[in-house]
Amino acid sequence: MISRYTRPEMAVIWEAQTRFKIWFEIEAHAADALAELGVIPKEAAKAVWTKARDVIFDVARIDEIERETKHDVIAFLTHLAEIVGPEARFVHQVMTSSDVLDTCLNVQLTRAADLLVDDIDKVLKALKKRAFEHKMTPTIGRSHGIHAEPVTFGLKLAYAYAEFSRARDRLVAARKEIATCAISGAVGTFAQIDPRVEEHVARAMALTPEPISTQVIPRDRHAMYFATLGVIAASVERLATEIRHLQRTEVLEVEEFFSEGQKGSSAMPHKRNPVLSENLTGLARMVRAYVTPAMENVVLWHERDISHSSAERMIAPDATVTLDFALNRLAGLIDKLLIYPQNMQKNMDRLGGLIHSQRLLIALTQKGASREDAYKLVHRNAMPVWRGEGDFQTLLKQDAEVKKYLSDAEISEQFDLGYHLKHVDTIFKRVFGES
């Protein structure tokens, strides 16, 4: 995590103090369950809560102990014993470090997912608002970067809305998959600990018991979680890239909001660059980069090793913090996006009507021309216009072979922009419902 791309709401989840608070809660809830089962005295379990529930753990002290013990959980338990006193000997009874570490990580990941779902909701809200504003604003659709046929700018935003709706569903599913708890002891057999302890801790921490753990929670769950973040990041970049292309000087159909006093270049005072979209492109690359180590973490030796640990200490905070920042930036970008319908119309007109070529092709075939002949007739009139030599509709009306099939009025009819937009309402209802 670097502060430049970190929001405090997400950062707090990954702070050391938060981690130690979660560790304490796991240990204390486990002690409660062990007390109910008669394994440890009930007074000892109560004392753990009473003496440490509201404590601010001394992170520096824990780090000091870890430098000697070379073990983070033992360092924490040692510091906890300094706070709790004699009753601390009943803490971590019959548990192993992975019980604490893995359960804590999943608590943090579920909390992060909750924030990310809220972030996606902000993006969806902004997209829906702007989509309805420009539901019928005509613009050119492009394939391979080349003018194809008319769409509306509202449809472009509706595409993104549908994509982020899917992203939200995937994230909710990934959150559910990662929300498991393991308090199963060494090698996961419950040999030293009653499974009811795990069930109690799971309920207390708003998790579900891991059906079968091998001392660690299986990392395919985490791989799915981070893969989901990677897909969401790809969606962020797809929309950011669309904005970057549409802000090109020679296109200028949209533009990022440019605030009073903002500067675009240290050398060229006229510049207004799509810096937010470019920033999002870079952030998305980083989130996707964390997917690979998450996948590789699935492969652990036998019942456990800690090859996953060092990677997760980096990818868990970095991926969630970065995506959180990116989604919030994207929501603001869409909300303030400057949209230029007049430039959209001007760009549509640049090719002299060629964007209606498919309608002419279909009209000719419906009047009796073979598809091959119809294609040749449309193509031979389109290519001069592509080179800037005339107007498509005019050339078609001057072509004797075309006139065998279509009258001037029928040719003109094929250039109706509204024809391309007749099902926009239907598409919007599919995407947004009846609202």
Task: Show which residues each predicted segment covers.
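Long, amphipathic alpha-helical stalk/connector segments used for oligomerization, subunit docking
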Residues: 286-369, 377
